[in-house]
Swiss-Prot record:
<comment type="function">
    <text>Catalyzes the epimerization of trans-4-hydroxy-L-proline (t4LHyp) to cis-4-hydroxy-D-proline (c4DHyp). Is likely involved in a degradation pathway that converts t4LHyp to alpha-ketoglutarate. Displays no proline racemase activity.</text>
</comment>
<feature type="binding site">
    <location>
        <begin position="127"/>
        <end position="128"/>
    </location>
    <ligand>
        <name>substrate</name>
    </ligand>
</feature>
<feature type="binding site">
    <location>
        <position position="274"/>
    </location>
    <ligand>
        <name>substrate</name>
    </ligand>
</feature>
<dbReference type="Pfam" id="PF05544">
    <property type="entry name" value="Pro_racemase"/>
</dbReference>
<keyword id="KW-0413">Isomerase</keyword>
<feature type="binding site">
    <location>
        <begin position="279"/>
        <end position="280"/>
    </location>
    <ligand>
        <name>substrate</name>
    </ligand>
</feature>
<protein>
    <recommendedName>
        <fullName>4-hydroxyproline 2-epimerase</fullName>
        <ecNumber>5.1.1.8</ecNumber>
    </recommendedName>
</protein>
<dbReference type="GO" id="GO:0047580">
    <property type="term" value="F:4-hydroxyproline epimerase activity"/>
</dbReference>
<feature type="active site" description="Proton donor">
    <location>
        <position position="278"/>
    </location>
</feature>
<dbReference type="InterPro" id="IPR008794">
    <property type="entry name" value="Pro_racemase_fam"/>
</dbReference>
<comment type="similarity">
    <text>Belongs to the proline racemase family.</text>
</comment>
<feature type="binding site">
    <location>
        <position position="248"/>
    </location>
    <ligand>
        <name>substrate</name>
    </ligand>
</feature>
<feature type="active site" description="Proton acceptor">
    <location>
        <position position="126"/>
    </location>
</feature>
Amino acid sequence: MTYIPRQWIQVVDSHTGGEPTRLIYDGQHWPFAGSREGALTSQESPSPSVLSGLRKAIDRSSLILPKTMSERRQFLETEADWLRTASLLEPRGSDVLVGAILTPPEHASSQAGVVFCNNTGYLGMCGHGMIGVIVSLGQMGLIAPGPVTIDTPVGSIAATWSGSASVTLTNVWSYRYRHAVSLSVPGLGVVTGDIAWGGNWFFLIGEEVHQKSLDLGNLSDLLAYTSQIRSELGRQGIAGAQGAEIDHVELFASCDSSIADSQNFVLCPGGAYDRSPCGTGTSAKLACLVADGKVAEGGLWRQKSIVGSCFQAKALSIREGERGLEVLPQLTGEAYVTGVSTLQIDEADPFRWGILPPQ
């Protein structure tokens, strides 16, 4: 007798520079659909107009579909968080995994919408995740090589898919919010860093301050150090614009200049470290370099991750705004699909919605 799960979620897994992304695109009780008709599947053949085919496939709106991407993020958080917890928490997921929930586009000129999330909640944007999403959609036959625009809660992301592993995307306008912020940390003394926005909020610390070795053999020390700093930022009420939580801490160090301009270590919101160079973190770093006059418009910055993977960032445009100098980062990286699967949810499973943290 064939076993039929009571509920299911369809996903495509990929990694970008070692950091995994799970594209969550369909399922029973899908929050952005009135039925499963027209669902995205990896078996579909590309239509002559691939982008319009993608729009038709995911434009399955129901009465509950919020209009804007920020409203959709809020809806998922308050009304449909089961989709995140079932897909990303153990036993199906892990604290390393970033989710990308596919939605219809917000704007007529875009091809899709994505809400990023992880084991603790929702993200405004995710650079490595967007690269993984685009490569996944391409391998599913739902976009063609060339330009594509994906809407997110923090803005529309224009990108170009090479047709293979490489993606170049234009991130959101990024800026340094505060320079040389001194933070008194018990046991560590005074730690000085910059606060910057690159699609998420970061506290960035140079090697002259942290004096740590950024290598995989030093992970325990790096995690403890950055976790303590993040906790102290919250405890002391040091935040981004409009009181936004600084949920990423990023360390930088010099490296072999023939490979990259610097190496980083990034503590992510869920307590895991980023295996990739971190797209939003690289954008935040670029914003600081622009503010310091170290990178001009059109300038390049190569960022190496803790595992050795690299992103290239370009200061595509620089402008003077209300928040000071702002830079429009262009990022290039590579992603690879690692699996296409259907997650099964059995009503008899006590952990069918994931192993939930204590309330």
